[in-house]
C-alpha cells in the first residue's frame, strides 16, 4: 500500500543506499551530526527508540529537514512506539525482529516498515505482516554469503543489511542483493568529531554510489 511517507522513505533508501543509525546521540550533538549526514548524501536517519527523548528527536529532525531527508524510528518494540513515531512525522519504522502486531500497525500508519529477519521463516512472517523492506539483522555474522543464498528466493521484498556492516564489507552486501545498509558508528565514528565524521561518511557514500 503506497503512501507519500512510505514512498519518500523508500526513494531515499534506494537512492542513497545507506541508513544512518543514530543511537542515543546526546542532545547537543544530534543536529550537528544529522546536518553532516544529510549534506554528505545520507538522507535516511534512524532515531533508535531506546531512550526517553527518541520521539522528540524524530520530531526535531522532521521539522529541520522536511522532505530533504527521511527521518524514522528504529528499535521499535511496540504498537505504541510505532504510533508515537508516526505522530512525530516519521517516514519509516525499523523493528529489531518480527513483531507482527507492531509491523502491521506501522504499515497501516503509512510508514515504510522494516522488520529484522535472519531465517526464511522470519522472512515469510515479516512479508505477511506488511514488511516493505527486510532488515537482515545482524548482518555480520553470518555475512553476505547468507544473504546471497536467501535473497533470490524472496525477490518480492528488498533487503537492507544492518549490524556489523563497515565501509570495508558494505560492497559485498550490495553484491549479495541488499539495496541498502544500516550503519551507526562505523559510518560516522565519534559524533563529536565532525571533521572525521565527514571523511568517514564520504568514504561510505563513495562505496555506495560505486556499487
Predicted regions span which residues?
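Conserved N-terminal beta1-alpha1 strand-loop-helix module at the mouth
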Residues: 1-91, 108-109, 156, 167-168, ...
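Structural detector of well-ordered beta-strand residues that form the stable sheet scaffold
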Residues: 19, 70-72, 93-94, 114, ...
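Short secondary-structure boundary segments
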Residues: 49, 75, 96-98, 117-119, ...
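Catalytic cores of alpha/beta
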Residues: 78-88, 121-129, 146, 165-181
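Hydrophobic, well-structured mid-protein blocks that either form specific transmembrane helices
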Residues: 80-122, 126
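Glycine-rich phosphate-binding active-site loops on the catalytic face of alpha/beta enzymes
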Residues: 92, 96-105, 135-144, 176-200
Amino acid at each position: 500500500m503506497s503512501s507519500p511517507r512510505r514512498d519518500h522513505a523508500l526513494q531515499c533508501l534506494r537512492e542513497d543506499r545507506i541508513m544512518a543509525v543514530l543511537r542515543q546521540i546526546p542532545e547537543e550533538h544530534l543536529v550537528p551530526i544529522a546536518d553532516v549526514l544529510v549534506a554528505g548524501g545520507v538522507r535516511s536517519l534512524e532515531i533508535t527508540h531506546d531512550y526517553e527523548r527518541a520521539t522528540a528527536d524524530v520530531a526535531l529532525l522532521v521539522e529541520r529537514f522536511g522532505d530533504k531527508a527521511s527521518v524514522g524510528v528504529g528499535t521499535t518494540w511496540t504498537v505504541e512506539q510505532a504510533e508515537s513515531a508516526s505522530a512525530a512525522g516519521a517516514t519509516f519504522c525499523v523493528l529489531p525482529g518480527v513483531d507482527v502486531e507492531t509491523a502491521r500497525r506501522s504499515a497501516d500508519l503509512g510508514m515504510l516498515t522494516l522488520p529484522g529477519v535472519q531465517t526464511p521463516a522470519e522472512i515469510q512472517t515479516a512479508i505477511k505482516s506488511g514488511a516493505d523492506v527486510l532488515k537482515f539483522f545482524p548482518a555480520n555474522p553470518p555475512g553476505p554469503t547468507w544473504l546471497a543464498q536467501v535473497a533470490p528466493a524472496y525477490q518480492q521484498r528488498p533487503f537492507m543489511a544492518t549490524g556489523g556492516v563497515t565501509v570495508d564489507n558494505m560492497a559485498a552486501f550490495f553484491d549479495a542483493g541488499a539495496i541498502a545498509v544500516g550503519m551507526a558508528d562505523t559510518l560516522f565514528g565519534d559524533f563529536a568529531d565532525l571533521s572525521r565524521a565527514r571523511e568517514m561518511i564520504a568514504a561510505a557514500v563513495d562505496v555506495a554510489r560505486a556499487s
